[in-house]
Amino acid sequence: MAPIKEFISKFSDFKNNKKLILSSAAIALLLLASIVGIAATTTNQNKNQKITTLSSTSHAILKSVCSSTLYPELCFSAVAATGGKELTSQKEVIEASLNLTTKAVKHNYFAVKKLIAKRKGLTPREVTALHDCLETIDETLDELHVAVEDLHQYPKQKSLRKHADDLKTLISSAITNQGTCLDGFSYDDADRKVRKALLKGQVHVEHMCSNALAMIKNMTETDIANFELRDKSSTFTNNNNRKLKEVTGDLDSDGWPKWLSVGDRRLLQGSTIKADATVADDGSGDFTTVAAAVAAAPEKSNKRFVIHIKAGVYRENVEVTKKKTNIMFLGDGRGKTIITGSRNVVDGSTTFHSATVAAVGERFLARDITFQNTAGPSKHQAVALRVGSDFSAFYQCDMFAYQDTLYVHSNRQFFVKCHITGTVDFIFGNAAAVLQDCDINARRPNSGQKNMVTAQGRSDPNQNTGIVIQNCRIGGTSDLLAVKGTFPTYLGRPWKEYSRTVIMQSDISDVIRPEGWHEWSGSFALDTLTYREYLNRGGGAGTANRVKWKGYKVITSDTEAQPFTAGQFIGGGGWLASTGFPFSLSL
């Protein structure tokens, strides 16, 4: 595409040069050029005829496949412009689209690098935001690469539903990453100038990813429907076995996921967990900081690496990067092992970078730890824990802060028996996150503020993301309960256009306002959001006076609620057993 743009640009410069004087020599050259042009046109017509012959089927397939996307013109023109081999299937169109998207992402990466190197007068937060972009763009490249590999194996390597879930998760996360990059430039006017320089490229990639996601969703849902239709001829028993496998994943005869190593099985079966490294602030362990222990952990490991963090207060910011896979943080108990920080937006951080602990590497686990950010309500966004780790889980952990406490950024996540406390949007992000048996408490905010338990960030209707709160307790801390009439508290508000939050089988105290939910800004997203409640109890659970938005609905049956269980929403049957944590796959 770049050479084409350069050609058009040069042609436009030539055309607009009004000082051009056509001398007799120039006229002669033009005549010569016209003769050459006629010959070239004849040759090109023959070539085009060949391309048309080859691509007539491709044209029809491409047009049909792109019709399922949100941006069909972009879908068609992007792939059609590349020429290349003839397209014979929906899968080939998706692969071609993903390859083009990868090229665009690489272009954006170098654009950000150039801004960092050459733009003068950048503020510290702008530099931080640009580095956030490099991180999320790098993650996007990995996600697209894995998606293409998974597509090559489709549909034979694993079950259709597992293929579908994995592909949709990868591209959903890629879309989220583009928005995260731009969100880093939304704090003041100076930030927005840098944002403008990145906007076109980031939005282009987001739209390309959106198209790929729509095509993947269409292909996999069609294939699953066809499989189930063929499967109707099988016996009832076989049907049930197949359906069970789709929910529970590929398990061995002992009920463990097949990918789980023998060593990890022994680890999970044991009454005590053996640590590979120990952190102690008094010097009695292998390391005195958590960050040092993470740095020493192996990269891209298929084996669980357990870091025991002894009781103590660790004042540091810790990042478990994407290369640090299968890391487990094991504390001595909530309130005993505390990792604390105070980064915040008011003092110059981005929301993304403010996290005290950020877990990105796949299959991250944590138990018996307190994560906190002590910045306070006047410092605005200040994250205690940010999670972008796929197949991550947290057990008996505390997340304490004020605004934006728990950032469930992306991928599949699970929280059980955790305590989450905050004020504004204190559970937010665009992961597919399930919270079970957790205590979720709003606390007293600053004067004039309203408490919002959730702010879910789904930006595309085909993303398989959302926040599910099941069998939890939603209430307030003692300092809020004493003045609850002064500070309204709501279940959530829509951060992005297709925000999706489901609260079911939970106890909701009367700290929650009768209307339940709050708008973000005017009528934004009220028709497109998905807010659901099901079989909740408590003083704030009544739905008679809930909001009357088009996107809000009370679920009335188990069948309608089932897709939001851990078994289906995050494919928990295939991986939650490997955590060793308690969980429920169903209602």
Swiss-Prot record:
Source lineage: Eukaryota, Viridiplantae, Streptophyta, Embryophyta, Tracheophyta
Keywords from the named record: Aspartyl esterase, Cell wall, Cell wall biogenesis/degradation, Disulfide bond, Glycoprotein, Hydrolase, Secreted, Signal
TM regions (residue ranges): none
Enzyme class: hydrolase
Signal peptide residues on this chain, from the entry's feature table: 1-40
SUPFAM superfamilies the UniProt entry points to: Pectin lyase-like, Plant invertase/pectin methylesterase inhibitor
Protein name, UniProt field: Pectinesterase 2
Annotated organism of origin: Arabidopsis thaliana (Mouse-ear cress)
EC number: 3.1.1.11
Similarity remark: In the N-terminal section; belongs to the PMEI family.
Catalytic activity: [(1->4)-alpha-D-galacturonosyl methyl ester](n) + n H2O = [(1->4)-alpha-D-galacturonosyl](n) + n methanol + n H(+)
Gene Ontology terms: cellular component: extracellular region; plant-type cell wall
Location in or out of the cell: Secreted, Cell wall
